[in-house]
Design a protein with these regions (language model features):
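Beta-strand-centric surfaces of beta-sandwich/beta-rich domains
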Residues: 1-100, 107-203
């Protein structure tokens, strides 16, 4: 067991983050591992969030999700968390602006216990996060290190599953450096399996 990772999870070395995601339908072009599918578009400026569900049951007095908590960064890249009360298929605007959204989860629900519909979180009509129906939280392998923090990646894993034979997934771990350059830090090709790769040296 890596006891340093346990200590990090306890908060003894600052804060640990476990990021994971899922993409249900990847084709022959590169996509980001996240609920919405396609390539993730990072905002270039902080903006108000628009939060809406595809189902009317996700509302303040509904049987589905009633409130969602959104985690991300403000215009200064500082950590910011807000809770939004849903209004079904009617969009609700946040009072705060975000330049990054990297997680959202159902924080209050009715008798259904979680969200009934898909909950989209957007800025300027572009989806920045989505909670797929029944999932209760985002599944997005996307993260930005906040201002005044230093991030270290200690490993990654990737898996694929396909019903057809001879289907392969070419996956890579991408990091944006402080100068804005995108760097591939790990890459592997798999077919109907999962690869778990701890790094001997954190990156």
């Amino acid at each position: 067991m890596d006891f340093s990772s346990v200590q990090a999870a306890k908060g003894h070395f600052g804060k640990s983050i476990y990021k994971f995601g899922f993409n249900s339908a990847i084709s022959t072009t590169e996509e980001t591992v996240w609920d919405e599918g396609g390539t993730y578009a990072y905002p270039t400026a902080a903006a108000v969030l628009s939060v809406v569900s595809s189902n009317a049951a996700d509302a303040a007095a509904g049987t589905g999700a009633r409130k969602v908590t959104i985690e991300g960064l403000d215009s200064d890249y500082k950590v910011q968390t807000v809770e939004i009360t849903l209004n079904g298929t009617n969009a609700v605007a946040s009072t705060e602006t975000f330049i990054r959204v990297y997680r959202a989860f159902v924080s209050e629900a009715g008798s259904g216990g979680t969200n009934t519909g898909a909950i989209s979180i957007s800025t300027s009509s572009t989806v920045r996060a989505e909670i797929s129906a029944g999932m209760g939280q985002t599944l997005m392998a996307v993260y930005t290190v906040p201002a005044d923090y230093t991030g270290y990646i200690v490993g990654w894993s990737i898996g694929s599953g396909a019903t057809a034979a001879n289907k392969y997934l070419d996956g890579r771990l991408i990091v944006r450096d402080p100068d804005g350059i995108l760097l591939t830090k790990a890459r592997t090709t798999i077919s109907n399996t999962t690869v778990i790769q701890p790094f001997g040296k954190a990156i």
